[in-house]
Amino acid sequence: MNTEIEVCIDNLESLYNALSGGANRIELCSSLALGGLTPSFGMMKQAAKISSVPVYAMIRPRQGDFIFDYDDILCMLEDIEACARAGVNGVVLGVLTPDGEIDMSAMQILSSKAHQLKLAITFHRAIDQLQDYKVPLEQIIELGCERILTSGLAINAEQGINVLADMVKQADGRIDIMAGAGVNATNAKMIQSTTQVPALHLSGKSTRPSLMESNSSAQMGSNDVDDYQIPVTDANKISNVRAALTA
């Protein structure tokens, strides 16, 4: 099996690095430190121009849970239309109810819009906030999604391997199960061979120093964030995962 590697990024420098490392697909976000939010139209358009592999844009209007109200859904619909105008290949989304189930009415609205615009859909790790996956997996298939990104309902994919394997069996080729969260060169082959997932998802994150000299004590945001350290994908971390899979 030729395992796909999807790399999540939140800047264009990381896009170049992910491509250099051998990514098969890009999940384009803003604010990966918050779990990934919707990228700007300009970023989507530029990424679509640059990328030699499919680009899927995150549709998530805010950080926090995946319970979205009427205004949020309207915003998400506009963002899906922006994705089509920008030229990306797909969208990444998920909506839940307060009871911890998939919000099928909201998802039907969003997925219908995406399908109408010829955009493929990945249902993201919102599924990992549910108590069980069996019924939700069937619902996601019913919605016409292409794949599910999941850690197997665990804190990371390595700890979720048993559920991931069961999800692959239940899916039975009707939808791709993509393992994500904590995937790296050390555990990638074990996760893939144990679960038989066709795809792995990671950021390959690292940091680089700012090109600007630090000459101020002012902070642009949280004091926990160093404005002079830029988070970027490390191309070597991506290529090392590829090498581990083929070893």
Swiss-Prot record:
Residues 205-226 are annotated as: Disordered. One of its GO terms (molecular function) is copper ion binding. The keyword tRNA-binding does not apply. Pfam families: CutC. One of its GO terms (cellular component) is cytoplasm. Its main location: cytoplasm. Residues 205-222 have a biased composition (Polar residues). InterPro entries: CutC-like, CutC-like_dom_sf. It is found in: Cytoplasm. SUPFAM superfamilies: CutC-like (SSF110395). Keywords: Cytoplasm. The keyword Cytoplasm applies. Belongs to the CutC family. PANTHER family: COPPER HOMEOSTASIS PROTEIN CUTC (PTHR12598), COPPER HOMEOSTASIS PROTEIN CUTC HOMOLOG (PTHR12598:SF0). This is PF03932 family protein CutC. It comes from Vibrio atlanticus (strain LGP32). The lineage of its organism: Bacteria, Pseudomonadati, Pseudomonadota, Gammaproteobacteria, Vibrionales.
